[in-house]
A protein has these predicted regions:
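Conserved, helical-rich catalytic subdomain that frames metal- and/or nucleotide-binding sites
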Residues: 209-279, 315-317
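Short, conserved beta-turn/loop elements at beta-strand boundaries and strand-helix junctions
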Residues: 167-168, 191, 286-292
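Short beta-strand-centered aromatic/proline hotspots
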Residues: 279-286
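Short, low-complexity Ser/Thr-rich regulatory SLiMs
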Residues: 141, 163-170
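Short, acidic (Asp/Glu-rich) active-site segment that either coordinates a divalent metal cofactor
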Residues: 171-208
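N-terminal lobe of the biotin/lipoate ligase/transferase fold
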Residues: 1-123, 142-161, 270-271, 314-317
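Structured surface patches comprising rigid loops and adjacent beta-strands/short helices at the edges
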Residues: 289-291, 297-317
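Residue-level signal for inorganic ion chemistry
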Residues: 44, 88, 114, 136, ...
Length: 317
């Protein structure tokens, strides 16, 4: 089935994407159909949002081989060579019962689904793939993987990013999520990155064991593994919260135990954000509402709901 927003010049389905529908049906998933594959799109999230307004069903997926206006959190550009990676959006309809407060929790659940699918694809027995609050999947390197205790900051490379956008009905206390657009950018086949990305990004192909044939890395299999994780966890978390997945999320938390630098209004430990653009502390995990727990140098434990959290000027972002 073609999307009504499809570009007329869309190319035939790439070989490693031909099995998506069959795998979705084989596993009995509620997500993945219909699947709309575009040779090029501005943004798959924009396609999904437009289709959602026109009544597209729950579980619909839009995938692009190339994006001209792909974006991540806070408007950052997501760059990807044509046909090498997974750039897709999933439309979720929570059924009118999901409060807005659940959105941060669902962003983490999506990150966990991407992390789990990536770990399966590369055979991540060492547990190097982690979820970095609030919406990235990263691969730990070197001493970070070994759990160095000499005070050195951990080192990681970004593998994937998640962007959630919502369509709301009602207002105030009655506001509910009518449609949730889950956008994912996951590096799969890319082996070299331009500019500064060369030292900050990675891909499934680069993370696999040396000598593993690249052709065995199927984007269809990885995509369906992500969809299966969402199928398993999203409905439960949307209704009841993070309790079911919290232990898994804690085990995969990239920031837990690390010294962090927090920026932004809701990360500020005073009532006057302009007076403290940044502050430092130690991350103690993620709570059941999806907020980052950071104990400041003043000893106070704070719950960070938004803003930027880094490892500091010498660490990975």
């Amino acid at each position: 089935m073609r999307s009504p927003l499809a570009r007329p010049g869309a190319s035939p389905r790439a070989p490693d994407l031909r099995d998506v529908e069959a795998l979705v049906r084989e596993r009995g998933l509620s997500l993945g159909l219909p699947l709309h594959v575009e040779a090029e799109a501005g943004s798959t999230n924009d396609l999904a949002k437009s289709a959602a307004r026109d009544g597209a069903p729950h579980g619909s997926v839009w995938l692009a081989e190339s994006q001209t206006a792909g974006r991540g959190r806070q408007g950052r550009v997501w760059s990807s060579p044509r046909g090498e990676n997974l750039l897709f959006s999933v439309l979720l309809r929570p059924g009118g019962a999901m409060p807005l407060a659940r959105l941060p929790e669902l962003s983490l659940v999506v990150g966990l689904a991407v992390r789990d699918a990536a770990a399966k694809a590369v055979g991540d027995a060492a547990g190097r793939l982690r979820v970095k609050w609030p919406n990235d999947v990263v691969a730990l390197e070197g001493d970070a993987l070994a759990g160095a205790t000499d005070g050195a900051r951990p080192r990681w490379r970004k593998l994937a990013g998640v962007l959630l956008e919502s369509q709301i009905t009602g207002s105030g206390a009655r506001a509910k999520v009518d449609a949730l657009i889950v956008g994912v950018g996951l590096n799969v086949h890319t082996r070299s990155f331009p500019g500064e990305l060369g030292s900050t990004a990675t891909s499934l192909a680069l993370l696999r064991a040396a000598g593993a044939p690249a052709e065995e890395l199927s984007r269809a299999a990885v995509l369906v593994d992500v969809l299966e994780g969402l199928h398993r966890d999203v409905a439960f978390v949307a209704e009841r919260g993070l309790g079911l997945v919290h232990a898994r999320l804690t085990a995969a938390d990239a920031l837990r135990g690390q010294r962090v630098l927090a920026e932004g209004p809701t990360a500020c430990p005073t009532a006057y954000p302009s007076a403290c653009p940044t502050w430092e502390g130690t991350c103690e995990g993620i709570d059941l509402e999806g907020k980052l727990l950071v104990r400041g140098d003043d000893g106070v434990l704070r719950r960070v709901s938004s803003g930027e959290v880094h490892l500091g000027s010498s660490g990975s972002r």
